[in-house]
């Protein structure tokens, strides 16, 4: 599956999708080799229907690699040189594209959200397991060292005690009301909706810090959600601002989460956690690219833990972790196991039911 360059293994990647996220992922994969513990090479790039676009992406974003360009996904997944495919198409396409790759015996890393709903995700996980293939959702923040540091402070050192009040906000001003009606962000059939686009980040932070608390004993929270919604040009309903409250009875903790495409970030700290002992923990940066932890004790003493970097975006943590999984013949990543992906999909399905947002993919699993 891998080849050798001297004494170092090389992981060969194929890209299914050549958009803006793929460009950033490619830059981190091969543009900052000093950041990596494993060697990576992009050997193939495909778009759904344009070899020219694939070739242009390869030339503009994959140097020093010289990947083969394909004008269809079907061609790339049959390329024997590819060890793993990275899928960055829009999320309504994930189910079909992941399934195509798995049926052609390719290991898969697929951008978040893995699918539109839980039944799609479950089917893909079961397919990967049946074919004994590595498969992971590309939720890159789970691989950041800052996440491990925050969990150590809270779950092992118990710096904020045992009962938490968590606030997380991920909001950006897309001038939503001014977007053209045919914009992807305003077309539900194309995956429009802030919950799946952005809201999964605050939800993930709540699971990392509250759900994963050993004292919670893996008990799922109660969920209450509200949203501001819009009607698209097809008459479908999507959400553009959504608020979710999660209550964890086992630890008497609560998470209040907000996400919006119609408001900008209010402060440098996207996350605040109040502890029962008066201590507070803040995480600054972006919800998807955290930079530092600040612990303010009730006494006024402040500690800052810096994890900032400016030479890359931050995908390299995920990329190396996935490579290590392949080299060790692991079938899922410990940072984002299949069980957690499925539980997150169940959670977003539950929230969507509460805010009355559905997608065409949901209709495949609706029974009379």
Curated annotation (Swiss-Prot):
* EC number, as in UniProt: 1.1.1.179
A GO BP annotation: D-xylose catabolic process
Q: Protein name, please?
A: Probable D-xylose 1-dehydrogenase (NADP(+))
InterPro entries recorded: Gfo/Idh/MocA-like_OxRdtase_N, Gfo/Idh/MocA_domain, NAD(P)-bd_dom_sf
Q: Which reaction is the catalytic activity of this chain?
A: D-xylose + NADP(+) = D-xylono-1,5-lactone + NADPH + H(+)
Instruction: Give one GO term, molecular function aspect.
Output: nucleotide binding
Question: What function does the entry list?
Answer: NADP-dependent D-xylose dehydrogenase catalyzing the oxydation of D-xylose into D-xylonolactone. May also display activity with other sugars. May play a role in the regeneration of NADP(+) in the presence of these sugars.
Which Pfam families does the UniProt record give? GFO_IDH_MocA
Where does it sit, as one GO cellular component term?
Answer: cytosol
Which Gene3D superfamilies does its entry note? Answer: Dihydrodipicolinate Reductase, domain 2 (3.30.360.10), NAD(P)-binding Rossmann-like Domain (3.40.50.720)
> Where is this gene product found?
Cytoplasm; Nucleus
């Amino acid at each position: 599956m891998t080849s050798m360059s001297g004494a170092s293994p090389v992981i060969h990647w194929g890209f299914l999708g050549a958009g803006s996220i793929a460009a950033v992922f490619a830059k981190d994969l091969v543009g900052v080799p000093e950041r990596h513990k494993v060697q990576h090479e992009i050997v193939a790039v495909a778009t759904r229907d344009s070899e020219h676009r694939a070739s242009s992406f390869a030339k503009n974003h994959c140097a020093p690699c010289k990947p083969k360009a394909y004008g269809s996904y079907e061609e790339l997944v049959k390329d024997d040189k590819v060890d793993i495919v990275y899928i960055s198409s829009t999320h309504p396409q994930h189910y079909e594209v992941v399934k195509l790759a798995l049926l052609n015996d390719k290991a898969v890393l697929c951008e978040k959200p893995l699918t539109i709903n839980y039944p799609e995700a479950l089917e893909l996980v079961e397919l990967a397991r049946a074919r004994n293939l590595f498969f992971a959702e590309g939720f890159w923040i789970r691989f950041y060292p800052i996440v491990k540091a925050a969990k150590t402070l809270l779950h092992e050192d118990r710096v904020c005690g045992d009962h938490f009040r968590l606030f997380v906000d991920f909001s950006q001003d897309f001038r939503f009301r001014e977007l053209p009606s045919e914009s992807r962000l305003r077309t539900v059939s194309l995956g429009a909706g802030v919950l799946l686009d952005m809201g999964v980040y605050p939800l993930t932070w709540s699971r990392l810090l509250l759900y994963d608390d050993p004292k919670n004993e893996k008990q799922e929270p109660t969920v209450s959600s509200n949203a501001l919604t819009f009607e698209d040009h097809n008459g479908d309903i999507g959400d553009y601002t959504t608020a979710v409250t999660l209550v964890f009875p086992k630890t008497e903790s609560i998470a209040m989460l907000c996400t919006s495409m119609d408001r900008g970030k209010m402060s440098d700290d996207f996350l605040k956690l109040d502890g029962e002992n008066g201590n507070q923990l803040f995480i600054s940066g972006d919800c998807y690219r955290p930079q530092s932890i600040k612990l303010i004790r009730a006494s006024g003493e402040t500690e800052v833990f810096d994890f900032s970097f400016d030479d890359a975006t931050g995908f390299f943590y995920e990329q190396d972790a996935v490579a290590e999984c392949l080299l060790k013949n692991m079938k899922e990543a410990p940072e984002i196991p299949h069980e957690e992906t499925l539980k997150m999909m169940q959670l977003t399905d539950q929230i969507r039911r509460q805010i009355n947002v559905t997608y065409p993919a949901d209709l495949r699993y609706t029974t009379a």
